[in-house]
Amino acid sequence: VNGFALADKKTNVNLIRKDVGMVFQHFNLYNNKSVIENIMLAPRIVLKRPEEENRELAMKLLDKVGLANKAESMPAQLSGGQKQRIAIARSLAMKPKCLLFDEPTSALDPEMIDDVLDVMKDIAKNSNMTMLVVTHEMGFARAVADRVIFMADGRILEDDSTEKFFGDQPSTERAREFMSKISGH
């Protein structure tokens, strides 16, 4: 990450963590804190960002994810798609260089998925941030990714450009099976 080998025992992982954001499939918001407090918490504690600057950035991020009107709401008052967009805003508040997404749409109702994917597409298009996305949303991967890594049983089976992976037939039988099943729906 950012030129450092995480597997190298000499690498100080704690120095790298502040440059890497993570969006989990189950949001992990603090239920006892408002939306804006959830977004402002890590930058205040980790980065020691001043309150006014922190609040201003949090509101900009809420606007970016289409939820500025929910700043004072509690997580229990939000839909799953709204919670996931708040989780994305919370990660962006740390101004990471790399953002990791772990199946960000898997816990969502189908009608909420597009809202989250639209936010992610906007990040991919309008920022210079590296995004690593674990997803089964192949349409999203095809539209946004510049590289596709296909994994099965914990092993990398394919590592190609998006054009090659989706344009040509994948080189492994397992990837071809997967692609034929999802294209059949």
PLM regions: where:
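C-terminal boundary and immediately downstream tail of ABC-type ATPase nucleotide-binding domains
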Residues: 163-185
